[in-house]
């Protein structure tokens, strides 16, 4: 139901290979709990019209937060994955306790008067870094400048169930599992992150580092990366390559492309060249769909043809790039994905 939103009892029985009495019993139970609701009727083919049923989007909500070096991004999401409120506030990250208190206050203000407290399942917090979820520790975050940083103070300050996730992993969670059960997510933000799922589940690796595509060597001996190595994909494919480390906005850069600025067009063409190499390598290694997300992913939909042509030039085994997908959320993907964790958890407990 979370994937389809609206369906019928007969379709559920067919999809799940269940008997109609079993489906009726479970659907009626969920209708009684107000998780589901009747949404209308199907056109009659003779006899009584079948009722359509769907998720009651207002049954519960979850909040998502993305923490960056200079901002926090907040969203409130309903059970239909719809963003019903969002805000982005400038707040410089510090490792001090006062930061946790300030975030908690911003959350309280954001939620004030929005919904009944008992419908809020929890807060998902997306962080750019490697996270030990069991111990509630950020093992390392170059973006925030922290190492072995405890998240328990922030958890206590929020006073609501909290889930912590790497920002790229969270963005992957924002995508529908049914649509992309096996996929790579390239998070083309200020820094380059990544994630991938297998059979609808995030693959984390032995040390929580799976999907760190930004630190694969793309150009041996090339540009210096913030991690200390040279030639990392991040130094060639992150949004910062286009924004000159935030000296200009991505929107301003794209406007210059539209106006035909030759220098900007050259930078963009080189960027797509390097991105095409990275995509080709990932496709050869994983043989799955590749979702283009993050700030740059949000604007790539208008440039899929030139990007696809460059990718095909590096891949002699395939003659199309239908595996390249645009992200579902051009903005707020990490915050939404972190929030959606609570829907999956809650539905599993019903």
Q: What are the functions of these language-model segments?
A:
Residues 83, 137-138, 202-203:
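Hydrophobic "anchor" residues
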Residues 38-62, 162-185:
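Conserved phosphate-binding catalytic cores of ATP/NTP-utilizing and phosphoryl-transfer enzymes
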Residues 86-88, 152-153, 159-258, 262:
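Glycine/GP-enriched mid-protein hinge/lid loop-to-helix segment characteristic of carbohydrate kinases
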């Amino acid at each position: 139901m979370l994937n389809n939103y609206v369906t019928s009892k007969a379709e559920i029985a067919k999809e799940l290979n269940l008997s109609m009495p079993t489906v009726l019993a479970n659907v009626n139970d969920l209708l009684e709990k107000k998780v589901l609701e009747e949404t209308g009727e199907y056109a009659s083919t003779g006899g009584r019209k079948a009722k359509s049923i769907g998720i009651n989007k207002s049954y519960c909500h979850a909040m998502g937060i993305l923490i960056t070096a200079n901002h926090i991004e907040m969203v409130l999401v309903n059970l239909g994955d719809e963003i019903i409120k969002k805000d982005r506030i400038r707040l410089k990250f510090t490792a001090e306790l006062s930061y946790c208190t300030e975030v908690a206050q911003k959350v309280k203000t954001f939620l004030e008067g929005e919904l009944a407290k008992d419908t809020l399942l929890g807060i998902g917090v997306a962080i750019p870094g490697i996270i030990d979820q069991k111990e509630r520790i950020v093992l390392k975050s170059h973006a925030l400048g922290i190492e072995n940083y405890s998240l328990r103070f922030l958890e206590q300050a929020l006073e609501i169930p909290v889930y912590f996730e790497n920002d790229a992993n969270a963005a992957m969670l924002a995508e529908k599992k049914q649509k992309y059960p096996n996929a790579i997510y390239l998070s083309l933000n200020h820094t380059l992150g990544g994630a991938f799922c297998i059979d609808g589940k995030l693959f984390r690796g032995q040390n929580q580092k799976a999907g760190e595509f930004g630190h694969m060597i793309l150009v041996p001996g090339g540009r210096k990366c913030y991690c200390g190595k040279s030639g990392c994909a991040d130094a060639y494919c992150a949004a910062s390559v286009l924004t000159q480390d935030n000296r200009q906005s991505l929107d301003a850069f794209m406007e210059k492309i539209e106006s035909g600025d030759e220098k900007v067009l050259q930078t963009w063409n080189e960027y797509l060249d390097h991105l095409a190499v990275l995509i080709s390598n990932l496709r050869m290694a994983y043989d799955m769909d590749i979702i283009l997300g993050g700030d740059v992913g949000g604007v790539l939909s208008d440039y899929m043809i030139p990007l696809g042509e460059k990718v095909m030039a590096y891949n002699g085994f395939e003659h199309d790039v239908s595996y390249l997908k645009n992200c579902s959320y051009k903005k707020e993907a990490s915050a939404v994905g972190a929030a959606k964790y609570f829907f999956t958890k809650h539905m599993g407990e019903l």
